[in-house]
Amino acid sequence: MFKESATLDFHYNKIDEAALAFFRSIVGDEFVLTTGEHYEKYAKDETENLRFYPEAVAKPNTTAQVSALVRYCNEHKIPVYPRAAGTGLSANSLAIYGGLMITIERLNKIIEIDENNLQVTTEPGVITELLQNTVKEKGLFYPPDPSSRGTSFIGGNISCNSGGPRAVKYGVVKDYVLNLEVVLPNGEVMWTGANVLKNSTGYNFTHLFVGSEGTLGIVTKIVLKLIPHPKFNVIMLVPFTSMDQASAAVSAIFRAGITPSCLEFMERDAIDWVCNWLGDVTIPIADDVRANLLIELDGNDMDYIQKEAEHLYEVLTQFDCGEILFADSDAQKNDLWRMRRNVANAVKTTSVTIEEDTVVPRFYLPELLRHIKEVGKKYNFRSVCYGHAGDGNVHVRIIKDELSDNYWKNEVPNGVREIFEKVVALGGTISGEHGIGWVQRRFMDIKFPEFQMELMRGVKKVFDPNNIMNPGKVF
């Protein structure tokens, strides 16, 4: 069973006037917040119905400023919470124990695009989509594209090792991070690696920090690998009469030697909700359709893409699918992507919800989806399933509806545990890209025996013996 974090064994000091004076001397009076409407947003992220207020928020704009703030907090036993754009879904950056929140929003410059080496050096507060569009102007491509790419920061993506739809072909954030400048919990500054494509020199600190959710340090500069931007793509929406058929088709597509650049799953309710919410997207969906796959093929040779699309069509006809909608214009392509990327926004406007981030080997998707619906019936909750079927990553949006607060708080988590137990039994894990944060810690025992949790705590202790860096997260 879940073992409560050792965080509570640490004594933390409150931020006093002397500390506030020091913070202001480092970043300036206007960049230290303790009250006001602008301060309010730092108490929450996209995890619903949670509020944890930091005692102060600091907004540095240099590595030296971050280092000075962290060093002071370490010396005075004040907890530090690194914050990106606040798009996290697991309370990843919330100030569980008060202390100082350090936001990276002013570390927002793209420093250099190296077209010769296909690299970009950036600060962590750059919006993901802005970085993608900027390098695209040079004919270059940074593929990881979480649904929050229009608001999330690159630094936050690194914190959770984000993926997104294109991960199925191009990989996740860790596959593009070459080097990181990091402020350690004692205030020291280090580069984790080198700006090279191969590095077998000592332990891989770069990959250790990617996905560490701000528990080991604060990233202040990032070197990313880029690739040439593909010139063409074909996008199609494929309807199925059952979730079983749609999810079974996923594995068959890859077994046929086809590697889509995106392969997304949406059950029928997801599409109905999002189309109603958007209002201006009209996608014809037959009454008997229960699920859809959104599939993209891309590359630099349109003839080859069309042949691959024909091969894909042959595979799909082995399943109970309806008429395939091929997007025949950029506007229609954009509509299909708007529909997929806004499912979560649409569903959560109807009720309080929680979103789980399951991932299994893709052949087992049908079994997982059946189990999710069975658990929902057992615990009397509705759910909407959608996500990155191509790499087995299904998001489960559980809807509170009219459930009592007590039942939602105390019984629904038992259903979530049953879902995660099935996920792990199928060879999967409890988070593919959202991270563990604060809200998912209670499920870590499903995946990891206690000795492995102790190894993680040991790594944390080496970097952060005073446990000031994002305490209360992961374990």
Set out the residue ranges of the language-model regions.
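Conserved, mostly hydrophobic/aromatic
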Residues: C73, G214, V396, D464
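C-terminal substrate-recognition/cap domain of FAD-linked oxidoreductases
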Residues: T34-A43, L224, P228, L237-P239, ...
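FAD-binding subdomain of flavoenzyme oxidoreductases
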Residues: K109-E264
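Alpha-helix capping/hinge segments and adjacent helical runs
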Residues: D29, V424-I436, P465-M469
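General beta-strand structural signal in soluble alpha/beta enzymes
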Residues: V32-G36, A58-P60, V80-A84, A91, ...
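Activity-critical C-terminal alpha-helical subdomain
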Residues: E188, Q440-F475
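N-terminal flexible segment immediately upstream of the FAD-binding catalytic core
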Residues: M1-R71, T87-L118, S147, A270-T282, ...
